[in-house]
């Protein structure tokens, strides 16, 4: 039960972070409070960091908000493709 609650809190914090209501530092402080400074806490903080620096909301090769494609259309007129959590203009996935 405690693991499920921790996962639920973590997912809630990620959802709030993606809406730009909180910054990365405050979410990592909440992780330290709820999970602690252990292996699981470090993993959670690494995921938050990776998602926080994700400018175009690319998650697992999926453009969740179509902001990658919009950015590439404005910047170079090419289609935007998500490569993991990175946005690349005019470079489709090769796999």
Swiss-Prot record:
Stretch forming the signal peptide: 1-19
Residues annotated as transmembrane: none
Broad class of the protein's primary localization: secreted
Keyword Cytoplasm: no
Keyword Phosphoprotein on entry: no
Tissue and organ distribution: Expressed by the venom gland.
Record InterPro entries: Long_scorpion_toxin_alpha/beta (IPR029237), Scorpion_toxin-like_sf (IPR036574)
Domain BetaSPN-type CS-alpha/beta: 55-95
Any single Pfam family the record assigns to this protein: Scorpion_toxin_alpha-beta
GO MF annotation terms: toxin activity
Disulfide pairings: 58-82, 68-87, 72-89
GO CC annotations, alphabetized: extracellular region
Sorted UniProt keywords: Antibiotic, Antimicrobial, Disulfide bond, Fungicide, Secreted, Signal, Toxin
GO biological process: defense response to bacterium; defense response to fungus; killing of cells of another organism
Domain of life of the source: Eukaryota
Protein localization: Secreted
Function: Has antimicrobial activity against yeasts and bacteria.
Family designation: Belongs to the long chain scorpion toxin family. Class 3 subfamily.
Name assigned to this protein: Opiscorpine-3
Organism the protein comes from: Opistophthalmus carinatus
């Amino acid at each position: 039960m405690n693991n499920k609650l921790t996962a639920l809190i973590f997912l809630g914090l990620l959802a709030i972070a993606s809406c730009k209501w909180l910054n990365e530092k405050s979410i990592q402080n909440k992780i330290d409070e709820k999970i602690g400074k252990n292996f699981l806490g470090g993993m959670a903080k690494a995921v938050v960091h990776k998602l926080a620096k994700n400018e175009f909301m690319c998650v697992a090769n999926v453009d969740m908000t179509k902001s990658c494609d919009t950015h590439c259309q404005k910047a170079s007129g090419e289609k935007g493709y998500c490569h993991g959590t990175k946005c690349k203009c005019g470079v489709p996935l090769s796999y």
